[in-house]
Curated annotation (Swiss-Prot):
NCBIfam families: PRK05518.1, uL6_arch. One of its GO terms (molecular function) is structural constituent of ribosome. This is Large ribosomal subunit protein uL6. Gene3D superfamilies: Ribosomal protein L6, alpha-beta domain.
Length: 196
């Protein structure tokens, strides 16, 4: 029989002892606002030199407070999962701030041995032509607001959201994966060489 968890939730809200805490500094040129609470979730909005971005974070028992140029993430629960989520939330907030302040950049390389690969951007896709001599082009989706710049054999994925940039770079790498061939011999493809 399942026990009533109402008392556990109530004790989380009324407890004053902090078991895990992380403080994230907010730079002067970044404005960070917060809405919500631990039950409904928090919506954080960051505005900086590179633009604006929002992030929704929710985990009952993990609290976020903004003030005096700092973001305080803490939990009043002694459970491991709650303590771990404090670090996760702090990491997401740091990425949110870094994105609007400096932005993120992934650097990829186009590698081929015999058939020259042609890469171009078309709308919200990257078209990869003549990959290992294939007649039909391969396509990789550009996620969200990420921007792709192609310069010879170098591809740069830039943006303010690390998840959008990372997924776009992964899409490019996955689109040129050769199946049922030894990767030590068939090394053609697009590979991530530098991450933020």
């Amino acid at each position: 029989m399942r026990e009533n968890r109402g008392w556990e939730v109530f004790s989380l809200l009324t407890s004053t002892e902090v078991y895990e805490e992380r403080v994230v500094e907010v730079p002067e040129d970044v404005q960070l606002t917060i809405e919500g609470d631990s039950f409904r979730g928090y919506t954080l909005k960051a505005v900086g030199p590179k633009g604006e971005n929002t992030r929704y974070l929710k985990y009952r028992g993990v609290f976020i407070e903004v003030g005096d140029g700092k973001v305080r993430v803490y939990t009043t629960s002694p459970k491991k999962k709650h303590k771990a989520m404090v670090g996760t939330f702090a990491g997401h907030i740091e990425n949110l701030i870094t994105g609007v302040k400096e932005g993120f950049e992934y650097h990829l390389k186009v590698v081929y041995a015999h058939f020259p690969i042609k890469v171009r951007v078309e709308g919200n896709e990257v078209i990869i032509e003549n990959f290992i001599g294939e007649k039909h082009p391969r396509r990789a989706k550009i996620v969200g607001r990420a921007q792709v710049e192609i310069s010879g054999q170098d591809i740069y994925v830039r943006g303010i959201d690390i998840e959008e940039c990372g997924q776009t770079a992964a899409n490019l790498e996955q689109a040129t994966k050769i199946k049922r061939k030894d990767p030590r011999v068939f090394q053609d493809g697009i590979y991530i060489v530098k991450k933020p």
